[in-house]
């Protein structure tokens, strides 16, 4: 097939809302204020973004063979997990993003943009970054764990905004 792309070079940006519940059109950055690394420099994997639909059973009592369903609300359980290499630098940089979120007022949040290599669109979500947890640790392996975003709005694919 033609057109396949590699995950090498995925970029992750974020920006603070200036208008409540509205994706910013400027100000997206890859690095936390005062941070040393771009977010994508320590993220090793991204859980699927977007949501499935709940399915509601509307089977009438008279039905004797099959259930009937209708499409319900979108649902992703509200959680986006980013697998990360965890070390003092990545931890400090992620903490800086969490602190930027905590400093927002009037219910404003952060928007995250995920851009695939060569794509003209980014995938946008409004989300709250949670503090980094202590990772699972095993002998003979890299220290990796999840950093988590609590998604509260998904814009989906739209023209990328990279600065």
What are the residue ranges of the model-derived segments?
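Acidic glycine-/aspartate-rich tracts in secreted/extracellular proteins
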Residues: 86-89, 154
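Hydrophobic side chains in beta-strands
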Residues: 14-15, 84, 114, 151
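Viral virion structural and adsorption modules
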Residues: 1-5, 154-163
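Short, acidic/charged, Gly/Pro-enriched secondary-structure junctions
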Residues: 91-126
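Solvent-exposed edge beta-strands and adjacent loop segments
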Residues: 2-83, 128-142
């Amino acid at each position: 097939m033609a057109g396949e792309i590699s995950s090498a070079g995925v970029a992750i940006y974020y920006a603070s809302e200036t208008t409540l519940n509205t994706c910013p059109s400027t100000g997206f950055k890859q690095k936390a204020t005062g941070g040393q690394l771009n977010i994508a420099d320590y993220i090793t994997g991204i859980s699927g973004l977007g949501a499935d639909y709940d399915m509601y059973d509307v089977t009438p009592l008279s039905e004797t063979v099959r259930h009937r369903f209708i499409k319900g609300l979108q649902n992703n359980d509200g959680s986006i997990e980013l697998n990360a290499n965890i070390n003092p630098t990545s931890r400090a940089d992620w903490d800086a993003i969490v602190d930027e979120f905590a400093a927002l007022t009037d219910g404003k949040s952060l928007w995250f943009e995920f851009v695939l290599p060569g794509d003209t669109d980014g995938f946008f979500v409004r989300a709250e970054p949670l503090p980094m947890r202590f990772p699972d640790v095993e002998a003979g392996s890299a220290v990796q764990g999840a950093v988590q975003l609590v998604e509260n709005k998904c814009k989906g694919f739209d023209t990328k905004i990279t600065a």
